């Protein structure tokens, strides 16, 4: 389908802002150019804010798309490619995936405190047990490697020190040998905690605080949130090509 001049202008501006174009955007442009224009204006805000360096912006978008709650493969590929084009190393991108891979522990961060509540309500628990020497050592090791402690870890450390120890080893790896600066690591956590597919408020506040204490600016954190907010457009990028195909099959318009 030949584009109108207005559609071509939107396409050209989109490529200028985002540096990429694809079939999904083409189908959206054909179906509703006004929608794509409105999205472009929205998405251009973080792109033009430039509080984050371009490479870090792409790393944040990789985390949003690669999170277990989203797993948006087309976006992962696009933003991995863009990050590489902007000079990201294999080690940096691998570290983003390692940091993003910790999301699953929130099953325990949310679930263990609820389990403790149920045990107390059922008369099976009178209060927290005193930590053993091993548990105290694990807590100290966590603080040393991660630089913080949060009450959400208390129950897991008490009830399941084996899992806590294994998770500590898993989650501390990028902090021991990673190449991203600490505040950028925190941006990755903020990105997937803030995403509409997760919305994990306790972790979001914790990692915002960590980032601020590591020197992050308000503008940087706002830009991470702005980037995470764009995830909703994947409703259109996934479905618009399907809609266009079904319209062709049915002869609709």
Give the positions of each predicted feature.
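Short helix-coil transition sites and intra-membrane helix breaks within transmembrane domains
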Residues: 68-74, 104-108, 196-202, 233-236
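Alpha-helical scaffolds flanking conserved acidic
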Residues: 54-59, 90-95, 182-187, 219-223
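Mid-chain, well-packed structural core segment of small domains
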Residues: 72-91, 200-220
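Acidic, glycine/proline-rich low-complexity segments that act as flexible tails and inter-domain linkers
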Residues: 1-56, 85, 108-184, 213, ...
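Amphipathic, charged-and-aliphatic alpha-helical interface segments
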Residues: 57-72, 184-200
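Hydrophobic, ordered structural segments
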Residues: 94-113
